[in-house]
Amino acid sequence: MKVLAAGVVPLLLVLHWKHGAGSPLPITPVNATCAIRHPCHNNLMNQIRSQLAQLNGSANALFILYYTAQGEPFPNNLDKLCGPNVTDFPPFHANGTEKAKLVELYRIVVYLGTSLGNITRDQKILNPSALSLHSKLNATADILRGLLSNVLCRLCSKYHVGHVDVTYGPDTSGKDVFQKKKLGCQLLGKYKQIIAVLAQAF
């Protein structure tokens, strides 16, 4: 299920994800503007690069932890079950302007954040003893929240962008156990792939 929402208010909801809360509720703000609660840091782009590098450095370990925790048939069928075949994933163009790349990064991080929330919720039910996986998912979500905050600051402070249409990650609540595991694996495969591209692009 895709939910389109616009602007800073849904973003602020995403910035306060609770693990396992699923997709944030869509809210359409009235005349969305750049409302930042705290001053932006001077070295925002360095922080964004650092956070992307941190995510890129841990993405493969998260992917391995995930598919290992799912058990068979996942570890021996990665291409078939965990290929990054996510059709509604937001696009990214590495050769765009900084502003265009930041807008696309914003969309991607919102999508990934809600996806991770759904994956974490599902894994706590499907694999309650996989504590290292839960911890890694939570740590990744924390970095994504910080990254999102920095991207918002940069877009608002430098480019006066207060309105971006976003697509949230797919809701898995109505899917069966195998489909939840498979979609999670595909999303983390896509995450591993795109985060490497993003880390190189900034």
UniProtKB/Swiss-Prot annotation:
It is found in: Secreted. The keyword Secreted applies. Glycans are attached at N31, N56, N85, N95, N118, N138. Its main location: secreted. Disulfide bonds join C34-C156, C40-C153, C82-C185. One of its GO terms (biological process) is positive regulation of peptidyl-tyrosine phosphorylation. Keywords: Cytokine, Disulfide bond, Glycoprotein, Growth factor, Pharmaceutical, Secreted, Signal. GO terms for molecular function: cytokine activity; growth factor activity; leukemia inhibitory factor receptor binding; signaling receptor binding. One of its GO terms (cellular component) is cytosol. Residues 1-22 form the signal peptide. It comes from the Eukaryota. SMART domains: LIF_OSM. InterPro entries: 4_helix_cytokine-like_core, Leukemia_IF, Leukemia_IF/oncostatin, Leukemia_IF/oncostatin_CS. LIF has the capacity to induce terminal differentiation in leukemic cells. Its activities include the induction of hematopoietic differentiation in normal and myeloid leukemia cells, the induction of neuronal cell differentiation, and the stimulation of acute-phase protein synthesis in hepatocytes. Belongs to the LIF/OSM family. This is Leukemia inhibitory factor.
